[in-house]
Every structure is written in structure tokens, then in C-alpha cells.
Amino acid sequence: MTVNLLNFNQAALAEYFQGIGEKPFRAKQMMRWMHHFGVSDFGEMTDIAKALREKLAKEAVVAPPSVHLEQISEDGTRKWLIDVGAGNGVETVFIPEDDRGTLCVSSQVGCALDCTFCSTGRQGFNRNLSVSEIIGQLWVANKALGRDPKGDRIISNVVMMGMGEPLANFDNVVAAMNIMLDDSAYGLSRRRVTLSTSGMVPAMDRLREECPVALAVSLHAPNDALRDEIVPINRKYPIAQLMAACQRYLEKAPRDFVTFEYVMLDGVNDTAEHARQLLNIVQDVPCKFNLIPFNPFPNSGYDTSKPDNIRRFRDILMQAGYVVTTRKTRGEDIDAACGQLAGKVQDKTKRSLRRIKVEAVA
């Protein structure tokens, strides 16, 4: 059976080479060719012995996922629909800024968590992505963007904030992030790789031990009653448990704060009282806030908070001494903004079908 070498981080690749009678150092060579240089043809890997190249050509491949569609926004944001087979596709977004280039990477085909304000969740869930399908998004984007003439990185930051809950696909996501961090591959620092979770507490503890990168938490509500409703995983891991997990995570994190993401939903979670409740629940967690104006999608049932309400909410947090950013909406014209990623999901949960039936009855 043909082996896709993009599924291996360097440790797994060393095991693979030992298994075929080769020295483990071949793993470092292969990592550089695959990821640093973006080469998928063994014949072009000139410092690898010809006999080994011929052997690899018979039993292995370097096979990134294919791009079904590429779109470029008026603001320079780029979105790729990545074909992952069986009628499924995931979306990857590159956001260029003056001081950085951020790639937003998906971890699952759809999402099983069913947050009520998220377009991805509305699509249901099909499966976890493999390591090659996760790191392949970075591979594909690097190829498409080319090299900066000045030698600077075009992709300087990676955020695991695309489709899916990364910690629900723990092993594959961590293996892919290890490739991102590997100096023989992409060489990103732990501070420049951010994982966003809705709050899978046991997996947060495991991540702290196995691959502590920068942490963002999709909080979105300042009390359990509201969070139970809009972020259903809160029923399993309520806010007190989540805050305690954040404190534990910071013991080994590369940054000394957690970023709390908070989508601004008109009349739902955006009042001054909500802001004061938010200050109360985070008081023991060093943090900053990222306020996200809701990006509408069809039949969402929500509206974006009014600008004055967002400013009032922000000011209450800032007056308490916190760093607060309000996320700029990028790529909205190509549905690449936060919460808009939907891809193509062959839903195995039948969630989307159930919702259609409910809406039809209503």
C-alpha cells in the first residue's frame, strides 16, 4: 500500500525510514524537501541516493490535498476550498496584514459541537482530517503564495481556527503542529501557532503537556446559562472548569496570557451587564479579549451587534485594564470571515437535515 509521507512528523518519518532499512537521518532530509522546499517529486530530491529515490517512488508519495477552488477578496484575503474526497471540502484562509501573514487552518470536515452562531456547525460533521490534510493546507498555501522577494516569510502565523474543533482531532492536529514547529519544515515558533478551542478541558490539559502553543478560547458568553445555549459543550465543561484549565495551561504556554474570543451577537451577549459578568469570570486568568462582530450567514437567526454596543462593551473591558481588540472583518465578500467557513460537508450527523425540517415547520 502506498504511504503518504505528508502524514508523518519527523519522529514518525524516522521510524518509517528505519522500517525500510534506512538511517533515521533521512527523515530530516525528507522534511526539508517536502516542507521547506515544497517538493513532491522524489526525483528532484538531489541529496538523497538515487536507489532510495527509486525505492520511494514505488512505495510512497508526497500527496497534498488538491484545491477545488481559490477565491481572492477585494482586501487581499485568499480562500481555498480543499478537496478531501467523497464529496467533502474544507476551507483554508490566508489573511495578509502589514506586519504578518496569517493562515487559518481547518481540522475537521464540519464540526460536531453545534455552536449556534457558526456556519461550520450548521453543516454538520463528517470526519476528522488526517495529518496530511491538515499540514497539506499549509503546503498548498505556501505553494500558491510563492516566496517573498525580500526573503521574509509570507505565512508568519498559523491559527487553528478554521472548520472543526482542533482538540476533538487531537492526535492529528498535534502531529501537524509539530511539523509547523519543526526547523526542518516550517520553523514557526510556538508563539506564532495558535490553537482555538471551544473548551474541551481534558484535551487542553493534554495539549499543555504534549504541544503547548498559544491558546485562544472561544468563550462567547459570560455565564453558564447563556453559554450552555450557544456553545453546547459548556454543558459538559462549564465556565469554572474552563477557567481552571486556562490557568493550568498558562503554566507551560509560550505566551503569558490566553486570548478569549467573543462573538458579538445583537441583544444576546453584548450588554454592559454581560461585559461586567465577563470581567468577573476571567479575573484569575491573565488574558486579552478579541471581540468578533458576528458575520451573518443565511438563516442564522442572529444579527451583528450595533457598533455603539461593541464600543461600549470594549470600553468596559479596557477600563478594567485589559487589552481588547475588535477583529476587522476580512474576506467577507468571499465568505472567508470568522464564522462563515462552511466548505462542503457530507453530514453524517443528519444535523443539517433536522434543522431544515424544523425551519420548514416553523
UniProtKB/Swiss-Prot annotation:
EC code: 2.1.1.192
Lineage top rank: taxon: Bacteria
Molecular function (Gene Ontology), one example: 4 iron, 4 sulfur cluster binding
Binding site for S-adenosyl-L-methionine: G164, E165, S196, S218, L219, H220, N295
Radical SAM core domain sequence ranges: 97-333
Entry annotation: catalytic residues: E91, C338
Disulphide-bridged cysteine pairs: C104-C338
Record localization: Cytoplasm
Catalytic activity from the UniProt record: adenosine(2503) in 23S rRNA + 2 reduced [2Fe-2S]-[ferredoxin] + 2 S-adenosyl-L-methionine = 2-methyladenosine(2503) in 23S rRNA + 5'-deoxyadenosine + L-methionine + 2 oxidized [2Fe-2S]-[ferredoxin] + S-adenosyl-L-homocysteine; adenosine(37) in tRNA + 2 reduced [2Fe-2S]-[ferredoxin] + 2 S-adenosyl-L-methionine = 2-methyladenosine(37) in tRNA + 5'-deoxyadenosine + L-methionine + 2 oxidized [2Fe-2S]-[ferredoxin] + S-adenosyl-L-homocysteine
GO cellular component, one term: cytoplasm
CDD domains membership: Radical_SAM
Keyword S-adenosyl-L-methionine in annotation: yes
Key words of the record: 4Fe-4S, Cytoplasm, Disulfide bond, Iron, Iron-sulfur, Metal-binding, Methyltransferase, rRNA processing, S-adenosyl-L-methionine, Transferase, tRNA processing
Bound cofactor: record note: Binds 1 [4Fe-4S] cluster. The cluster is coordinated with 3 cysteines and an exchangeable S-adenosyl-L-methionine.
Required cofactor(s): [4Fe-4S] cluster
InterPro entries to which the protein is assigned, alphabetical: Aldolase_TIM (IPR013785), Methyltransferase_A (IPR040072), RlmN_N (IPR048641), RNA_MTrfase_RlmN (IPR027492), rRNA_lsu_MTrfase_RlmN/Cfr (IPR004383), rSAM (IPR007197)
Similarity annotation: Belongs to the radical SAM superfamily. RlmN family.
Miscellaneous comment in the UniProt entry for this protein: Reaction proceeds by a ping-pong mechanism involving intermediate methylation of a conserved cysteine residue.
Protein's name in the database: Dual-specificity RNA methyltransferase RlmN
Organism: Methylobacillus flagellatus (strain ATCC 51484 / DSM 6875 / VKM B-1610 / KT)
Taxonomic placement: Bacteria, Pseudomonadati, Pseudomonadota, Betaproteobacteria, Nitrosomonadales
